[in-house]
Amino acid sequence: MKNVIRTPETHPLTWRLRDDKQPVWLDEYRSKNGYEGARKALTGLSPDEIVSQVKDAGLKGRGGAGFSTGLKWSLMPKDESMNIRYLLCNADEMEPGTYKDRLLMEQLPHLLVEGMLISAFALKAYRGYIFLRGEYIEAAVHLRRAIAEATEAGLLGKNIMGTGFDFELFVHTGAGRYICGEETALINSLEGRRANPRSKPPFPATSGVWGKPTCVNNVETLCNVPAILANGVEWYQNISKSKDAGTKLMGFSGRVKNPGLWELPFGTTAREILEDYAGGMRDGLKFKAWQPGGAGTDFLTEAHLDLPMEFESIGKAGSRLGTALAMAVDHEIGMVSLVRNLEEFFARESCGWCTPCRDGLPWSVKILRALERGEGQPGDIETLEQLCRFLGPGKTFCAHAPGAVEPLQSAIKYFREEFEAGIKQPFSNTHLINGIQPNLLKERW
């Protein structure tokens, strides 16, 4: 496993991390060039110049979609009369297998505060909210202390750095709903409404929180902004090994020797992360499959491990980069059981607004449970494939259902024999269940 040496030039997000994993508070953060990007932005650049720099740097959203951050910012209204604007940080990190934002908020809370300060100035937003996953109790404590420190130091509040710019920042904890990761459901929840997605248009940039222009960005996205302003566009583009600029928090979980996450340049291959950083599979286990970016991404196989971790390459392979925290599956894990577990989560977390999602996901779970018990019926696999089509992109209000069926459709594609083994056979009472030969099963016919 590689010995990681973090420097400001190669690890703009994580170089300030302490070895004892304690949070970096204001004095230490400022001693390590903290708020230098904010100083340059607020005292030397106009809001439009900041938006242009972020756009030119090629910063893409780190929440999974990979949309241009600068372009998203430029969609905010130019009308100066619309002077009530909001900046929302989507910190509702509930994707199974993903924990990157938690690291940043717990150990580098001032990095997020600085990123939001610069972003708010660029967007002309006077108030910001960090919508935080309710279970992230330690992150909430650390963020609130960081906000208090920044306010006392004149880095938040009124007339910041003597520029006349005012910005207040608040932490709002969620109530444990996965769907709040969708930006309009997050806005509804923040307003005290039912957490279901809104119809688009209007988009949040024109009508968001309380009907006002609103920009929603992910934690890691906002944490990239200070380094771009402090070090420049060219530097940010050059630290990547890909046409996707910058670095990304990437990692592997599952039964690997050293599960974790690391800040790596875009273009690093999945095999490098698995073998050089995560240490490979545990002794006695064979690699079987992986999900590149969390539970809601398509499975890929060992043949795809040499792909660079970047949005386009993973997309062309039939999956999504997502959060870039991959989950490794070993040969002892049955795909039917694994997918059933994932679909149970997604079915439970559906907001119930759309009929296909509300009824289709529980239906898939019912079929998967039958296949897992060896009691599947002929045609069940075809029904699952049909459900994947019915729940695909454009069939529901938001991307919850399309993301939910990605692991299902890809598991059937690559491991169909494991699903076929769960179909009840009238002339045999032995089955290959989930890739493992069990004892004789009792006849059920």
UniProtKB/Swiss-Prot annotation:
Complex and partners: Composed of 13 different subunits. Subunits NuoCD, E, F, and G constitute the peripheral sector of the complex.
Function description: NDH-1 shuttles electrons from NADH, via FMN and iron-sulfur (Fe-S) centers, to quinones in the respiratory chain. The immediate electron acceptor for the enzyme in this species is believed to be ubiquinone. Couples the redox reaction to proton translocation (for every two electrons transferred, four hydrogen ions are translocated across the cytoplasmic membrane), and thus conserves the redox energy in a proton gradient.
Disulfide topology: none
Regarding protein family, the annotation reads: Belongs to the complex I 51 kDa subunit family.
Which EC class, in a word? translocase
Give Gene Ontology CC terms: respiratory chain complex I
Q: Which reaction does it catalyse?
A: a quinone + NADH + 5 H(+)(in) = a quinol + NAD(+) + 4 H(+)(out)
InterPro entries from the xrefs? Answer: NADH-UbQ_OxRdtase_51kDa_CS, NADH-UbQ_OxRdtase_suF, Nuo51_FMN-bd, Nuo51_FMN-bd_sf, Nuop51_4Fe4S-bd, Nuop51_4Fe4S-bd_sf
Q: Which cofactor does it need?
A: FMN; [4Fe-4S] cluster
Q: What is this protein called?
A: NADH-quinone oxidoreductase subunit F
Biological process terms in GO annotation: cellular respiration
The residues that the entry says bind [4Fe-4S] cluster are C351, C354, C357, C398
Q: Which organism is it from?
A: Salmonella typhimurium (strain LT2 / SGSC1412 / ATCC 700720)
The UniProt GO MF terms for this protein read: 4 iron, 4 sulfur cluster binding; FMN binding; metal ion binding; NAD binding; NADH dehydrogenase (ubiquinone) activity; quinone binding
Q: Residues that bind NAD(+), according to the entry?
A: G61, R62, G63, G64, A65, G66, F67, S68, T69, G70
Question: Does this entry carry the keyword Transmembrane?
Answer: no
Sorted keywords for this record are: 4Fe-4S, Flavoprotein, FMN, Iron, Iron-sulfur, Metal-binding, NAD, Quinone, Translocase, Ubiquinone
| Cofactor annotation comment | Binds 1 FMN.
Positions of FMN binding? 174-221
EC number(s) given by UniProt:
7.1.1.-
